[in-house]
Amino acid sequence: MPLDPDVAIAAPQTDLADSWDANRVLLYHVGLGAGTRPTDPAELAYVNERYLKVLPTFSVIPGFEAVRPAMLGPGLDYKISKLLHGEQDLVVHNPLPPEASVITTPVVEAVYDKGKAGLLVLRGETRTDDGTPLCTNRFRLFIRGEGGFGGDSGPAPEPWDVSGEPALRVSVPTLPQQAAIYRLSGDRNPLHIDPGFAARAGFDRPILHGLCTYGMVCKALVDGLLDGDTAAVGGWSARFAGHVYPGETLVVSAWKRHDRFLVQAEVAERGVVALSNAVLRPR
């Protein structure tokens, strides 16, 4: 059958060795729009290698490269065009350094049956080459039209309540060239740069990478709630609810709930939700 959870989960995976330096981090940050306040020391720390802080979402770059081969591994027989990135979850074990040599272990964690779609959960465990754990990234990927194979439907979603006045509401503009810059960090999907490809996919023009939106919103939360301290992020998860066109403005809202913040990001120009069911977990 196209999706076989037992085969997929049992299939051996290969660790990926990777490394980064300050230049790679700087490019990622600029791809998220960092540097817009050129006289603010807290903002400059994202774009000046002399005192560089690293957003934890940078870890999706090596994490994605590690899990990419597992997307079409044994037990996962489908057309890649059916794949839709549904959710992203990050757990930070230690702050990311500006330079590092790392190893990421990919894992097929689960394959759930969602009726009309399959849900593939891939996990990337990233550690330094001396064994220090840095982060865990989970990629939840919907495979459209590949459900109904009789598997486990997975855990129920957690309760979600964003009533009341938010602790933070901030507007985050995206640049018309945002996707063109972000793709330089490695995601060269033509959906984000080729107008013809985007039109065939049903969009008016190329859309922004979901993981770019994910990183931009995380930065807004770090700046607005954590005093710009990237090391204060313990976890960050979000559901990709809608697309963003480069040049649009995100309105990010966060509600304090016990030890975490519930977060939502909307597109101001179209009144649609881009990120939902998002949770920031400070250390």
Region spans (language model):
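Residue-level preference for alpha-helix termini and adjacent loops
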Residues: S19, E43-Y46, V54-G63, K82-L83, ...
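A broadly conserved detector of short glycine/acidic/proline-rich loop/turn motifs that flank catalytic sites
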Residues: R24, G31-L32, T174-P176, S185, ...
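Catalytic-pocket segment enriched in acidic/His residues
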Residues: L191-H192, G196-N277
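A contiguous, surface-exposed recognition patch within enzymatic or periplasmic domains that forms
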Residues: P2-V47, E158-T213, A220-D223
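HotDog/MaoC-like acyl-thioester-processing domains
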Residues: M1-T14, L83-V170, V244-G247, V251-R283
